[in-house]
Amino acid sequence: LVCVMWGLHACQPATGLIVPSPIYVDNHYHGPADPEITWNPKTKEWMIFYTSRRPFKDQASYVGTPVGVAVSKDFVHWNFAGYCSFDGVGGKPDSEKTYWAPGVIVEGDSAHMFVTLKDDSTPVWGGPSNIVHFSAPLDDMISGWRRVNTVVDTPISIDATVIKNGDHWDMWYRDRPTEDTGGLYHAQSHDLYHWTLNGLAKGDINNVEVTKHTYQEGAYAFQWKGYFWIIADPHKGLAVYRSKDAEHWDYQGIIMYEPGTRFFDNTRARHPSVIIRDEKAFIVYHVQPFLEYNPDTHEAGNDIYQKLSFLQMAELEFKDGKLFCDRNKVLYE
């Protein structure tokens, strides 16, 4: 009540800054989606890589999309840093090829991106997609990306997330090799360059009887509070899974379905990533505040306003072995 009467500054720590809502707006097409947040130890800055959708392109809003980059030195102020170039091609808001859902990790002196790539950008959704591995030096994570190899070459593979797990790396991604085998799949590597595809992920992740989710995309994996977590996007809020071994997954339920009260946070959260900072977990996600969701479809929006998207940040909380999120909580830095 005091905050309402006297304004947020009355409750703000004297040395703190309020993390804005939204944290980032793409100044060109206003369509940032699928955010992937990471820390760059070389440049000492946080970076968000995102699918740069193009709401003003009518039928081509979701294809011809480059990977955009926002950076921050203080975790509060996020600025546009450019569009990624791959093998020297790109760096512009319009792309000949389609890039979706960049999964980015830092290992040693290099960064690695596992991105959904479509060579055919024919509207509305383009041609076949693969998950392709690119690498870049830490001091050039915008224009320094060079192709390594294709990790998954089935034609509907999308949305890779990669996590280091002891002496190896685990990857999860959305795939549908045949008409009746759609779901979240698992792969594993000991060097990031050679991958073994292990088929459908185990446990509750693909168990429709348990989750009631017939479709999920945009999975993100991370470790926190002694567990491995996967947060996926079934277009009905965010689905949370927990595991002790990153192999057998238990379903927790849905978070962040109910609208928030912060500016442009008034609808369900979509396709997130998480970063751990000072033992706290912060979730970054995109929202489409003007989209009227149809519960029976996975539509992305028809007109310009429905397709506009913004990036938001909230803090995750851990209680009694489960994840929670109060997306209305004001964040201070």
Model-derived features: positions:
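Bacterial Sec-dependent N-terminal signal peptides
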Residues: 1-15
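Carbohydrate-active catalytic/glycan-binding domains of CAZyme proteins
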Residues: 11-333
